[in-house]
């Protein structure tokens, strides 16, 4: 197909730009299903994007899957201890992009120790106000990054993720997804178009 034998090809083939493929989900059609990803198949399709760099390709793929990463507004962070070291860098990058950060008490405390400001929002199970559900219903959060562990976190997270689906608020449940989304905001070109004959 390439006009050469495999043994004669270079180890790294010359490439132009980057391509990203993302799964698509029909969460709204599956009532009551927790939207956190696991080993079972929940994807109902996929979308692909191509661009001059990873960020642009990722943005295009997300658009193709009818998902939009916000470019401004408020990001809610609820991060398990396992990812608290990595989230410091990501939170700093979100701040530099102009986002306001709100977070659960534990996550906010960890960010504060690294001199990153965030507003504390109560966990749902704390039964105090304001909690994340009320903030979401008021339209005051644009993106949710929820990396949970533990039974209470899973229960809180399930309610929050379900409401996010119903309200159309983008949410991320993996550290890899969070890194990809932030990189796409840093280097992605939203209006980038490539002629199909250049692919």
Q: Model segments located where?
A:
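ATP-dependent carboxylate/acyl-activation modules
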Residues: 1-172, 178-181, 188-199
């Amino acid at each position: 197909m390439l006009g050469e034998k495999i043994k004669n090809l270079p180890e790294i083939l010359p490439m132009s730009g980057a391509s990203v493929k993302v799964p698509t989900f029909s969460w709204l059609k599956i009532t009551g299903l927790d939207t956190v990803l696991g080993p079972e198949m929940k994807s109902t399709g996929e979308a692909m994007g191509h661009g001059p760099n990873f960020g642009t390709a990722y943005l295009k793929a997300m658009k193709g899957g009818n998902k939009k990463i916000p470019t401004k507004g408020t990001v809610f962070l609820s991060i398990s201890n396992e990812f608290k070291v990595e989230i410091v860098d990501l939170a700093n990058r979100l701040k530099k992009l102009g986002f306001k950060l709100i977070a659960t008490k534990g996550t906010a405390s960890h960010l504060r120790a690294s001199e990153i400001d965030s507003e504390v929002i109560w966990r749902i199970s704390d039964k105090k106000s304001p909690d994340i559900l009320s903030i979401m219903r008021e339209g005051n959060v644009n993106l949710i990054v929820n990396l949970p562990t533990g039974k209470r976190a899973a229960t809180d997270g399930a309610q929050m993720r379900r409401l996010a689906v119903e309200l159309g608020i983008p949410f991320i449940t993996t550290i890899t997804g969070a890194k990809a989304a932030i990189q796409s905001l840093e280097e992605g070109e939203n209006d980038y178009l490539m002629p199909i004959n250049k692919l």
